[in-house]
């Protein structure tokens, strides 16, 4: 059957090592699959690390695909017979300015960035990706909370929400005992004040468990390792 698997991953999750283990294997097997990279410049909290910076740089190359197509066409139509070597070198030189060179060097084609809110562009791009019949990453830029201005401006607070007032975005407060995360945050902060060897490590979630209180008080004793839980555990022992 003419089916191509489609998987989706967020830019925040691109900091996890397992992603590159999978891409490494996929680039070798050349199995046809479309990977949608949903890039909203957010994980849960503000993304950090080299991969996040790399994805941001890709935005500077948003017009690259059209440019590359023109160069490829020029090489095909204008290079005479017997100049295959020169054409190949030109193609390799072009790769030096490829925004998706990280993925292409792993054997995975790259398309993008595209507007993740433009349905027509998404459909056209996915059809192109499917027809390529090999592993390809479609880099889609999106805005978290798109369509609701209040959420667009407060990404972290609107990652997961309960009841709220649509008009002003105010959350409906309920009488409830102190949350376990709040108890943890207070205890951690108190211990950190008492012992200078108490540190905090989080995997892109400083607010959820309340560890942000430690970050505010003792920023040099706090690390956010992005969405990389395995690394977080090994980082603790450094």
What is the predicted function of each stretch?
Residues 35, 110-113, 137, 200, ...:
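Conserved beta-strand scaffold positions in the cores of enzyme catalytic domains, especially
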Residues 3-6, 33, 134-142, 198:
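Generic beta-sheet signal
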Residues 133-135, 195, 230:
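Active-site lining segments that contact anionic ligands and/or coordinate catalytic metals
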Residues 1-38, 204-236:
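Thiamine diphosphate
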Residues 40-187:
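Long, well-ordered, tryptophan-enriched scaffold segments
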Residues 185-207, 212:
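Active-site diphosphate/adenylate-binding microenvironment
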Residues 1-2, 7, 25-29, 95, ...:
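Solvent-exposed alpha-helices and their adjacent loops that cap or buttress functional pockets
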Residues 113-118, 203, 226-227:
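Short beta->alpha junction loops
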């Amino acid at each position: 059957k003419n089916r191509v698997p489609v998987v989706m991953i967020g830019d925040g999750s691109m900091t996890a090592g397992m992603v590159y283990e999978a891409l490494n294997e996929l680039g070798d097997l050349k199995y046809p699959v479309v990977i949608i990279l949903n890039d909203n410049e957010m994980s849960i909290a503000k993304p950090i690390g080299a991969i996040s910076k790399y994805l941001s740089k890709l935005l500077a190359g948003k017009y690259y695909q059209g440019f590359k197509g023109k160069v490829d066409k020029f090489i095909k139509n204008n290079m005479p017979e017997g100049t295959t070597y020169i054409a190949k070198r030109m193609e390799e030189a072009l790769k030096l300015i490829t925004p998706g060179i990280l993925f292409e060097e792993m054997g995975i084609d790259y398309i993008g960035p595209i507007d993740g809110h433009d349905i027509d562009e998404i459909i056209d791009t996915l059809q192109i990706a499917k027809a390529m019949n090999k592993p390809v990453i479609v880099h889609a830029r999106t805005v978290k909370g798109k369509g609701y201005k209040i959420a667009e401006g407060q990404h972290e607070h609107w990652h997961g929400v309960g009841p709220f007032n649509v008009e002003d975005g105010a959350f409906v407060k309920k009488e409830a005992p102190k949350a376990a995360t709040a108890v943890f945050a207070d205890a951690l902060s108190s211990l950190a004040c008492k012992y200078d060897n108490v540190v905090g490590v989080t995997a892109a979630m400083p607010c959820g468990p309340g560890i942000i209180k430690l970050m505010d008080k003792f920023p040099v004793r706090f690390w956010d390792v992005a969405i990389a839980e395995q690394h977080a555990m090994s980082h603790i022992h450094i």
